[in-house]
Amino acid sequence: MDHAGATRRQALSRAPGCFYSGTDAHPIYVDRLGAAQSGKLPIVLVHGGGHTGACYLTTPDGRPGWAPAFAVSGREVFVPDWPGHGRSPMRPDFATLSSTEIAESLQRLLEEIGPAVLLVHSASGPMAWWIAEQSPQTVAAIVGVAPGGPANLLPVLPDDAEAVAKLKDDESLGCPVRVEEDRPLFIPPEFMRAYWANSERFPQQAFEAYRRSIVPESARLMNERFNIGGKGLRIADPANLSKLPILIVTGDSDPRHPRAVDAATARYLGAEFVWLPERGIAGNGHMPMCEDNSDEIAALIVAWLEAKGL
C-alpha cells in the first residue's frame, strides 16, 4: 500500500492550499483550489513555455482565471509550476531542462492525487500525450488548448543553427530556431506581442502586467519544441491513447496554431477538435485563459467534461 500517497491525499482533502510534488531532481510547486463534488474528477492545469501556473489563477487585467472557474464548477483544481518556473526550485543546469524531466515531475503529481483530468497548453501538450501513454491509470481525460503535438508529427530539423536559420517558415513550427543550451532563454516583449498577446481578445491595457509574468525558459525545451535533431518528445503509438477522451481547443487568431495543424494533431490522437469560430467564438489567440472571454471558453470545457461524465 502507498502509505505516503494515502497520507498526501488525506491532507489534500482537508483544505485549499499549496504543496510540493514532482521528482527528487525536479520538485514542483502546486496550488490547490476548490473541493471535489461527488462524481467529479480533479483537474490539473499545466502552463506552457515561458509561463507559470499564475496564468490560470488570474487574468492579466485582474479577473478570476480558469482555476477558480473550474473550482466553482465543483472540482478540485491543481495548478503546478514546471520545474525551475515560478515557485518551483531552479537548478543550476536549468538551461538543459528537458520535456521528459518536466513530464516526469507532472506524472509524479498525478500519481499522488489519483486519476485526474489533465488540461495542458502549448508546450505542455507533448508532455500530456507522453504521460497518458506512460501512466494511463493516472489520466482520465486530456484537454489540450492550442497544444503542441507529439514530435511524431514534426519534421526532424538539423542540429545546426545556421542550417535551421535557412529553413523556410513551417506553419506547424512557427519560425524554427536552434539555440545554444549554455544559458536560459529570455523571451523578448516583441515575441510576446506577436505570438501570445496579438489577438483582439487579449487585454492590451494589461500587457505590461502580462509581460512581467513571463519567465526565462530552458533552451533545451525550445530545441525540443522544434524537434531539433529529432529530440522532441514522442509517443510510441497513438493507439495507446485511443480510449482516452481528448479535446483539443483552438482559436482563429493564434499565428502558431492554424486550424490545419491542430486538426491534424486531433486526427492523429483520435481527439475531438473544437475550432472556436464554429462554436460562434471568434478572435481568440494563443492565450485564451487570459483573454476577455476566458470565462466563456472555460464554460465550454466544463460542459465537455460534464457531457463525458468526468
Where in the sequence are the language-model features?
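Conserved hydrolase catalytic core segment
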Residues: 115-156
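Conserved alpha/beta-hydrolase
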Residues: 61-90
